[in-house]
Amino acid sequence: MITTVVGSYPVVKKEETFLDKVKKVFGLYDEYKYAIERAVKDQVKAGVNIISDGQVRGDMVEIFTNNMYGFDGKRVVGRVEFIKPITLKDILYAKSIAKKLNPNVEIKGIITGPCTIASSVRVESCYSDNRDENLIYDIAKALRKEVEALKKHVPIIQIDEPILSTGMYDFDVARKAIDIIVDGLNIKFAMHVCGNVYNIIDELNKFNVDILDHEFASNKKNLVILESMEKKVGFGCVNTKVKKVESVEEIKSLIEEGIEILKNNEKLNKNLSDNILIDPDCGMRLLPIDVAFNKLKNMVEATKLIKI
């Protein structure tokens, strides 16, 4: 089975040298490059198959709103439009590091979904409120261009839409927004939705994505959805909300429980190793870095022990 991550990793900054400080004065110093290097090296060392760049430059919303027309921070002050690729530079840098360490490692592109971005901003201009369909679709159009910039460099792009588990956004609008992003592009898409999803799996199955990624370690009620999922499964198996590092045996037991339920799913083919990706429940940004690394390491070890 393939192992991956949801995205974010704890940010570690190195102590600045005199030369670094001089570069900073002239705008030539990137304080986040070391954090990307550490995130990549840790993920590769842990044995993860498909890594991320660590999403080190801010929270999942600010990374995008800080780099699109129409936003001033998390305030909407004009029509939302694409400016230039937002995550591509970090993806390419992370990929260059990873390939030197292990040529077989892949890296995923990650974007925050249009509904989740919309839910996190205050609308002051151009749109009625943060549930305005036009705002959501304009964000989706900008994200489409981001995806077009990424697709030549990654095998999979993940769309983070945690807000969908709250019921705050209309699913038809959300699906249309995702369609704007993915339609006609020859690349695999995953959609990450954390929280309780056992009451909305029928709606999530209708999204035009290849993989649905959910949390199962911190929310075992979600296990029931494995019987009715119609997409490949991103199986969150380590709890990213707590600092306790699960043992290899704990993680292995949960994955095996999920596999047993998946065996009853008549909508997926029976080659289960092709239908499940193993990952943490959510991003790991808020964890101590040693905890994050050891959770990933144990997750990979547990996965290797499982025979399907």
UniProtKB/Swiss-Prot annotation:
CC cofactor: Zn(2+)
EC number: 2.1.1.-
Keywords: Amino-acid biosynthesis, Metal-binding, Methionine biosynthesis, Methyltransferase, Transferase, Zinc
Protein name in the entry: Methionine synthase
Family as reported in the entry's similarity comment: Belongs to the archaeal MetE family.
GO biological process: methionine biosynthetic process; methylation
Taxonomic source organism: Methanocaldococcus jannaschii (strain ATCC 43067 / DSM 2661 / JAL-1 / JCM 10045 / NBRC 100440) (Methanococcus jannaschii)
Amino acids binding Zn(2+): 192, 194, 215, 282
NCBIfam families: PRK00957.1 (NF002119)
Enzyme class: transferase
Highest rank taxon of the organism: Archaea
Task of the protein: Catalyzes the transfer of a methyl group to L-homocysteine resulting in methionine formation. Can use methylcobalamin and methylcobinamide as methyl donors, but methylcobalamin is not considered to be the physiological substrate.
Cofactor descriptive note: Binds 1 zinc ion per subunit.
Classification via InterPro entries: Met_Synth_C/arc, MetE_arc, UROD/MetE-like_sf
Pathway(s) served: Amino-acid biosynthesis; L-methionine biosynthesis via de novo pathway
GO molecular function, one term: zinc ion binding
HAMAP family: MetE
